């Protein structure tokens, strides 16, 4: 019954949108999220995208699908992890010495591909940043060739420098 890790789609009175497909709480639009920082709606079609903190500098942008699963599963004894406190590995220290971005991403993957209803990320930082911020779509002619593109803030620089030139078309 918790709403943690979920994106809700409700009306102004807090009632569930009648088109939501989640089988449990009818207010739920998507589930399986770790730490959503922002939701932006693409102007061309109104589709919702989330900017989300992943573990170990493994952040994602995801196009939401009604009833879809974000894929977050912080289970222990996967990806090289041993037993974790309270059987939850989502908040282990994220600065392991000598771990490359790829090894960190495999250690606690943001999107667990075992889920058949997984919403695959539209973008993943591959372990190179430290926390996505809010997101927005650029609107107006002043943006030139970038009009209609999505931007997301990065709250810190991770290992290997800043990812540059990455975008969602």
Q: What kind of feature is each model-predicted range?
A:
Residues 1-169:
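Beta-propeller domain segments
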